[in-house]
């Protein structure tokens, strides 16, 4: 089944959170026409939400009655797949994504009629908008808790009976085997001597075998495990563009070598040009201290990255992603943008277009609003000056 990013606004093909592509099917005629969401149970599983919540959200969104019958979910009326997908995006935004980190790893916690998000990705707990009509339905129909206590108790209760049956079966098998064999012992002096020699030989062999097992096997097993770990570690390092670039940076390459590496990474992972530059920024800036230092000292390298196709957009998206992952950088985002602007790496047009059209993180947008206001004011003043000069001439 084809899959799509849970956040459809994220174009990164390596985005880890996926769900099935929504499938709709129109049934009936006239007043009885309805649209069936064929794979809603699978989508609900991918989102870790009750399918009834999604159906109810569609009912509210389209102002149409929903129907649930034998795990078949439908909405009265005829709707295109794109319209259903857009409504699903709204549901995901309001009732799945964490309001802090924007990852879909949340669960509902209902306390005294108030629903809160608990995010497994960032650990934050926060309330959701209780004004939406769906919240009252969720409170009345809370998520089903999966309890393992009953199944555990049943298993414990069955253990004595299972053990008893095993013992009974083993005893029966032993009795059957004994019935089929006739045992006798040669009591002659020669036979007794041979049995004695064989017993001594078997004991010696067993001791030697045990010593060999103790001294050799753990060492070879350990070496084998170490080799496996090294192979797995190497595979993980190259599993995504950022890791691939980070590994290459450990060789201290020249700027031109890094540019060539970015070209090969783009081809290897099938990235857009802006996504490649974004990955480069993420790899080059590993923490808040390095990020600020990097912006101030690596102007030449940043200019080279900016000259790549869509490189300026990639730089902005990269710093946005860094701020989303590390909130300590949020207080420095305006200074970072100012340095990039003053150094001629980014222009007013680049920054304003990113801010108004491409930026996705509300936290980052809010954090740099003062700088954007200053930039827009400066742009207006510059336009006024140009108009005055034209009037004078």
From Swiss-Prot:
Keywords: GTP-binding, Initiation factor, Nucleotide-binding, Protein biosynthesis. GO terms for molecular function: eukaryotic initiation factor eIF2 binding; GDP-dissociation inhibitor activity; GTP binding; translation initiation factor activity. This is Eukaryotic translation initiation factor 5. Residues 224-233 have a biased composition (Acidic residues). The keyword Nucleotide-binding applies. Residues 144-179, 217-247 are annotated as: Disordered. Catalyzes the hydrolysis of GTP bound to the 40S ribosomal initiation complex (40S.mRNA.Met-tRNA[F].eIF-2.GTP) with the subsequent joining of a 60S ribosomal subunit resulting in the release of eIF-2 and the guanine nucleotide. The subsequent joining of a 60S ribosomal subunit results in the formation of a functional 80S initiation complex (80S.mRNA.Met-tRNA[F]). InterPro entries: ARM-type_fold, IF2/IF5, Transl_init_fac_IF2/IF5_dom, Transl_init_fac_IF2/IF5_N, Transl_init_fac_IF2/IF5_Zn-bd, W2_domain. Residues 223-385 form the W2 domain. GO terms for biological process: formation of cytoplasmic translation initiation complex. The keyword Nucleotide-binding applies. CDD domains: W2_eIF5. SUPFAM superfamilies: ARM repeat, Translation initiation factor 2 beta, aIF2beta, N-terminal domain, Zinc-binding domain of translation initiation factor 2 beta. Belongs to the eIF-2-beta/eIF-5 family. GTP binds at residues 28-35. PROSITE patterns: W2. GO terms for cellular component: cytosol. It comes from Dictyostelium discoideum (Social amoeba). It holds the Pfam family W2.
């Amino acid at each position: 089944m084809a899959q799509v990013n849970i956040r459809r606004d994220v174009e990164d093909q390596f985005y880890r959170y996926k769900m099935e592509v929504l499938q709709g099917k129109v049934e009936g005629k006239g007043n009885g026409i309805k649209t069936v969401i064929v794979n809603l149970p699978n989508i609900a599983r991918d989102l870790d939400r009750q399918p009834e919540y999604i159906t109810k959200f569609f009912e509210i969104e389209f102002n149409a009655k929903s129907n649930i019958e034998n795990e078949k979910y439908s909405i009265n009326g005829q709707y295109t797949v794109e319209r259903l997908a857009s409504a699903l995006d709204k549901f995901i935004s309001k009732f799945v994504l964490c309001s802090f980190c924007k990852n879909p790893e949340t669960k509902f916690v209902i306390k005294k009629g108030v629903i809160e998000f608990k995010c497994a990705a960032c650990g934050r707990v926060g309330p959701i908008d209780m004004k939406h009509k769906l919240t009252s339905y969720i409170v009345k129909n809370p998520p089903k808790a999966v309890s393992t206590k009953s199944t555990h108790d049943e298993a414990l209760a069955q253990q004595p009976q299972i053990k008893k049956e095993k013992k009974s079966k083993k005893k029966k098998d032993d009795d059957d085997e004994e019935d089929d064999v006739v045992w006798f012992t040669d009591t002659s002096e020669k036979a007794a001597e041979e049995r004695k020699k064989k017993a001594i030989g078997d004991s010696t062999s067993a001791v030697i075998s045990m010593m060999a097992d103790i001294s050799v096997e753990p060492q070879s097993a350990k070496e084998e495990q170490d080799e496996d770990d090294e192979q797995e570690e190497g595979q993980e390092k190259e599993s995504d563009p950022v890791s691939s670039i980070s590994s290459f940076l450990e060789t201290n390459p020249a700027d031109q070598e890094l540019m060539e590496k970015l070209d090969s990474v783009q081809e290897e992972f099938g990235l857009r040009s802006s996504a490649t530059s974004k990955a480069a920024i993420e790899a080059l800036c590993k923490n808040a201290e390095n990020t600020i230092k990097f912006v101030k000292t690596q102007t030449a390298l940043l200019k080279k990255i900016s000259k790549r196709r869509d490189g300026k957009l990639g730089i902005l998206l990269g710093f946005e992603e860094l701020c989303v992952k590390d909130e300590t950088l949020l207080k420095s985002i305006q200074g970072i943008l100012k340095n990039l602007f003053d150094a001629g790496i980014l222009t007013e047009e680049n920054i304003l277009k990113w801010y108004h059209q491409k930026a996705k993180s509300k936290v980052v947008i809010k954090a740099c609003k003062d700088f954007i206001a200053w930039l827009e004011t400066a742009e207006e003043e510059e336009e006024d000056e140009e108009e005055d000069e034209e009037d004078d001439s």
